[in-house]
């Protein structure tokens, strides 16, 4: 381990929090004997989480691994109905589609960028399936979702 110093300091955090609704807090840990998947299992366990790997310039190995756990809230759009699990701000519209909800979340959660950190420093995680295009374009219905995806 390279140290247990946490960045930013408490004083820096307080100043950053005056301008931003979310402030990344981090420390560096030497993990030469850990794989990203092993770290994910140890950090997330049986709960909800994600593991993202970065690849730069077509390299085979990733430069960064991003692990997230215990989402504060989730949004799910199924059959045109947007549902919320967990804690999502009241100003997030649930009757205007996924894109409007995400736009409001991005407006609310503003974080500073730290040049010494990897490009992904937190924020919204998830995926948008192809069908979200129906919020922009009028397309015919697709076959029934028999796999509950």
For each of these PLM feature ranges, what is it?
Residues 1-149:
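Signature of the chorismate-utilizing enzyme
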């Amino acid at each position: 381990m390279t140290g247990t110093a946490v960045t930013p300091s408490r004083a820096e955090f307080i100043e950053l929090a005056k301008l931003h609704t979310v402030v990344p807090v981090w420390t560096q840990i030497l993990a030469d004997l850990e794989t990203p998947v092993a770290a994910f299992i140890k950090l997330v366990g049986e709960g909800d989480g994600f593991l993202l790997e970065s690849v730069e310039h077509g390299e085979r190995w990733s430069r960064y691994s991003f692990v997230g756990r215990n989402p504060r809230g989730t949004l799910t759009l199924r059959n045109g109905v947007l549902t919320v699990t967990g804690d999502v701000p009241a100003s997030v519209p649930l009757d205007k589609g996924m894109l409007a909800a995400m736009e409001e979340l991005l407006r609310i959660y503003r974080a500073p960028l730290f040049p010494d950190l990897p490009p992904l420093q937190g924020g919204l995680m998830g995926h948008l399936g192809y069908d979200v295009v129906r919020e922009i374009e009028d397309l015919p219905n697709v076959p029934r979702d028999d796999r509950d995806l």
